[in-house]
Amino acid sequence: MSKQQPTQFINPETPGYVGFANLPNQVHRKSVKKGFEFTLMVVGESGLGKSTLINSLFLTDLYPERIIPGAAEKIERTVQIEASTVEIEERGVKLRLTVVDTPGYGDAINSRDCFKTIISYIDEQFERYLHDESGLNRRHIIDNRVHCCFYFISPFGHGLKPLDVAFMKAIHNKVNIVPVIAKADTLTLKERERLKKRILDEIEEHSIKIYHLPDAESDEDEDFKEQTRLLKASIPFSVVGSNQLIEAKGKKVRGRLYPWGVVEVENPEHNDFLKLRTMLITHMQDLQEVTQDLHYENFRSERLKRGGRKVENEDMNKDQILLEKEAELRRMQEMIARMQAQMQMQMQGGDTDSSTLGHHV
C-alpha cells in the first residue's frame, strides 16, 4: 500500500511550474527580517530649521539635549560631526537610521575650509567599510556610508552663495546631494518658483552633480510615473518643518500659525515636505545602490590605485637599497684588495733591505 504524498510538497500550480516566481518574496522576507540601514547627512547654515525638519520627517526627536550656541561662540566655531542613530519600526519593517548633523557649518567668519571636516568624515566611512569588507568576518558589516546629503539653501538670498557652490562641488563625487530650500513659508509661491529656477540654473552653470531620480520603468503603473514626474519637477524641494500640533479646519495638524493663517507641514499645496519624504522613502534603495556602485566604487578604485603605487614605491626603494648595499660592498672589497696589495709590497721591500744588510756584514 503506497504512502500518501505529504500535502506540503504537492505542486498546486500547472505542470512545468518550478517556483522561481517566489524568489522576490524570499528576498523581501530576508530583507525585512534583517532590516534596513540608511545614513542621511544634513548640511547647512545654522537657523535654517534642519533639526526641526529631520524630526518632522521621521516623527522622532533626534536632538533632545542640543544647546544652541550664542553669536559670540559662532565667530570662531569649527564644524563638528554629530551622528545620531535611531531604530525605527513600522509594520514589522525595521530601519536603522543614522542622521549625521554638521553644527557649525558656515557659522564662522572665515568659512573657506569649513567643509574639510565633513569630507574627511565621508571618506572615513568609505575607508571603514573597505576595511570591514576586506576582513574575515563580512557577514555583519555595519554600513555607515553616507547615502544621501540634504543640503539646505537659505531662502533669504537670490540663489546659491559661493560657499554653497564650493561645498557641493567638493562632495558631489562622494555622496548623493539633494538640494533643499529651507523655511519656504518665508516666500510667496512666485518667489519660490523664481528661486528654484535660479538655483537649478546655477547648479547647471557650475556643473554641480546633484542626485537625479531615475526615470520610471515602462512597465510601472501610471500613478507611479506621474509621482516620479512631480518629484523631479519639485527639485530643489522647498520645505517647512514643525513639531507643533495646531488646530486647522477642525483637526490637529503639524504646522505654523501666522496672523494671516496656518502653514501645514504635510499639505502639498503649502510646501514640498511630503514630496521630499516620498522621494526619500521610495528612492532609498536607489540612493544606496548609487552610493555602492558609483561613489564607493570610485573611492575604492582610487584607494587601491594609491595602495598599489605605495607597494610599487616600496619595492623600488628596496631594490635601490640593495643596489646601494652591493655597490658599497664592492667598494669595500676593492679597498681591502688595495690595502692587501700595499701590505704585500711593503713586506717584499722589507725582505730586500734585510738581505742587503746581511751582505754588507
UniProtKB/Swiss-Prot annotation:
Keyword terms: Acetylation, Cell cycle, Cell division, Cell membrane, Cell projection, Cilium, Cytoplasm, Cytoskeleton, Differentiation, Flagellum, GTP-binding, Membrane, Mitosis, Nucleotide-binding, Phosphoprotein, Spermatogenesis
Region (G4 motif): 182-185
One record GO biological process: protein localization
Gene Ontology molecular function terms on file: enzyme regulator activity; GTP binding; GTPase activity; molecular adaptor activity
Modified residues (Phosphoserine): 218
Spans traversing the lipid bilayer: none
Record region (G1 motif): 44-51
PROSITE patterns registered for this protein in UniProt: G_SEPTIN
Residue intervals of the Septin-type G domain: 34-306
Site residues, Important for dimerization: 156
Subcellular location per the Swiss-Prot or TrEMBL entry: Cytoplasm; Cytoplasm, Cytoskeleton; Cytoplasm, Cytoskeleton, Spindle; Cleavage furrow
Main location class: cytoplasm
Superkingdom per UniProt: Eukaryota
Region (Important for dimerization): 260-270
Segments of this protein annotated with the region G3 motif: 101-104
Subunit structure: Septins polymerize into heterooligomeric protein complexes that form filaments, and associate with cellular membranes, actin filaments and microtubules. GTPase activity is required for filament formation. Septin filaments are assembled from asymmetrical heterotrimers, composed of SEPTIN2, SEPTIN6 and SEPTIN7 that associate head-to-head to form a hexameric unit. Interaction between SEPTIN2 and SEPTIN7 seems indirect. Also interacts with SEPTIN9 and SEPTIN5. Interaction with SEPTIN4 not detected.
Role summary: Filament-forming cytoskeletal GTPase. Forms a filamentous structure with SEPTIN12, SEPTIN6, SEPTIN2 and probably SEPTIN4 at the sperm annulus which is required for the structural integrity and motility of the sperm tail during postmeiotic differentiation. Required for normal organization of the actin cytoskeleton. Plays a role in the biogenesis of polarized columnar-shaped epithelium by maintaining polyglutamylated microtubules, thus facilitating efficient vesicle transport, and by impeding MAP4 binding to tubulin. Required for the progression through mitosis.
Homology family: Belongs to the TRAFAC class TrmE-Era-EngA-EngB-Septin-like GTPase superfamily. Septin GTPase family.
Name of protein: Septin-2
Gene this chain is encoded by: Septin2
